[in-house]
């Protein structure tokens, strides 16, 4: 039985500790006691989880505060380079439509994705890798293990969830650390409930405009942490549902080793986080962003009568969007943002403003004015944030799921699970808002 197995493992570990105490000589006699004193706080039955959430909020605050200016500088630099390239094409007498396709379509989307993704990843991934190198991540898995046990999933899934905060594709690949095929598949199917840093800018922007206007960055970080907690709760819920239905089974035995705390090797941390994670993820995103730019340009510039294809599709989807507390432009932006979540908000603005290329609002006041004139309320913003948290994975993540599972069936399931969840929650929010006369 499980109880007998746990008892046997406990006895083996205690015996091994007794043998080690008699046979091992330590250069630093009190290192074990030092680690245990730290663990008494970080893995405490009551305080361990709040401390973990506080650390997460600090990481988000540093990422939010640190990424703003580099993103702006990159955007301005790419804008200047775009004008140089445009002038070069004009000097070569390139047809106007081809110039617009290359610059306003492909180049604009590529550079937008890069300027939005690169700075947060360059900050988040090193901090994440630093926690990994120090030895904290196994403690985080320990804090969450009881919740995964109740969900009949593996505690190692906590590590893949943390990786998903940087990039869901990286988190899905990280599911290889889970030995059980059943539990590994559960982790893959639910990883998208963790918002990646491609979704952070949209969440942060909407929080700043509708919920934390004039407040400090700490308020935005706290609200963003709240969205992470909601994503984690949905992960536990769906892990339990999958474990009790299509992926039945008991959780495999999980021996979680808490390694000693160690001094991080900063050089290796930077190289591993920037090259193995940041550059890898950015390369995949850029690869799929180029064809997306072409499709978006075509829809924004091809007319049927007096309207563009973009406007026609938005009008067609409007009844569905209204039912979900949003509108057709928002739904279409999510669909066209399938290659990269970073371009969802710019596509919305492009539709609202009738532009033929991706549009930047400039500042939160201007964005609030544009959204307000198009019927947005705090309920709309809340529904968009929920759907940003719970919708189909981006194309990079979908390709990674297909590669890891070897099945289009499970890839479609990974797309359907968060999307159905998001649609249901948005419908409930919209229904409740109508019942109470808010909208």
Go through each PLM region and give its residues.
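Alpha-helical transmembrane helix bundles of large polytopic membrane transport and channel proteins
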Residues: 1-28
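Core alpha-helical transmembrane segments of integral membrane proteins
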Residues: 42-138, 142
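Hydrophobic alpha-helical transmembrane segments of multi-pass integral membrane proteins
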Residues: 110-137, 144-172, 289, 319-353
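Juxtamembrane inter-helical linkers in multi-pass membrane proteins
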Residues: 78-88, 138-173, 248-273, 321, ...
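Extended, low-charge hydrophobic alpha-helical regions
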Residues: 68-109, 151, 171-187, 294-419
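Long hydrophobic segments that form regular secondary structure
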Residues: 244-252, 261-318
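Alpha-helical transmembrane segments
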Residues: 221-238, 337
């Amino acid at each position: 039985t499980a109880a007998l197995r746990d008892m046997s493992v406990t006895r083996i570990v205690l015996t091994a500790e007794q043998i080690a105490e008699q046979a091992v000589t330590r250069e630093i006699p009190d290192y074990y006691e030092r680690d245990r004193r730290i663990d008494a706080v970080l893995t405490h039955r009551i305080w361990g989880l709040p401390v973990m959430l506080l650390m997460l909020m600090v990481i988000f605050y540093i990422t939010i505060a640190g990424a703003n200016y580099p993103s702006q500088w990159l955007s301005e630099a790419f804008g200047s380079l775009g004008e140089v390239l445009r002038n070069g094409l004009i000097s070569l007498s390139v047809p106007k439509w081809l110039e617009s396709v290359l610059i306003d379509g492909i180049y604009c989307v590529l550079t937008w994705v890069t300027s939005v993704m690169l700075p947060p990843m360059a900050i988040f991934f090193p901090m994440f890798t630093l926690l990994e190198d120090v030895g904290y991540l196994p403690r985080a898995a320990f804090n969450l293990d009881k919740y995964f046990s109740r969900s009949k999933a593996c505690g190692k899934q906590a590590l893949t969830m943390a990786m998903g905060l940087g990039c869901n594709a990286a988190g899905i690949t990280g599911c290889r650390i889970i030995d059980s095929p059943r539990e590994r598949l559960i982790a893959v199917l639910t990883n998208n409930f963790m918002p990646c840093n491609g979704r952070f800018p949209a969440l942060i922007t909407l929080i700043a405009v509708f919920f934390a206007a004039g407040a400090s960055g700490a308020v935005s970080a706290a609200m963003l942490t709240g969205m992470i907690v909601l994503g984690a709760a949905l992960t536990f819920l769906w892990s339990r549902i999958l474990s009790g239905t299509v992926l039945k089974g008991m959780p495999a035995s999980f021996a979680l080793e808490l390694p000693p705390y160690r001094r991080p090797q900063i050089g290796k941390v930077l190289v591993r986080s920037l090259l193995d994670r940041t550059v890898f993820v950015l390369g995949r995103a850029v690869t799929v962003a180029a064809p997306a730019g072409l499709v978006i340009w075509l829809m924004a510039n091809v007319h049927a009568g007096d309207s563009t294809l973009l406007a026609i599709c938005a009008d067609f989807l409007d009844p569905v969007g209204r039912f979900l507390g949003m509108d057709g432009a928002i739904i279409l932006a999510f669909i066209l943002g399938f290659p990269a979540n970073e371009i969802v908000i710019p596509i919305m603005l492009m539709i609202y403003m009738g532009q033929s290329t991706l549009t930047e609002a400039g500042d939160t006041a201007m964005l609030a004015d544009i959204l307000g004139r198009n019927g947005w309320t705090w309920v709309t913003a809340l529904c968009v944030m929920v759907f940003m948290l719970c919708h189909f994975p981006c194309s990079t993540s979908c390709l990674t799921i297909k590669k890891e599972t070897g099945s289009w069936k499970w890839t479609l399931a990974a797309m359907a699970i968060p999307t159905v969840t998001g649609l249901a929650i948005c419908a409930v929010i919209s229904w409740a808002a109508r019942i109470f006369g808010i909208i």
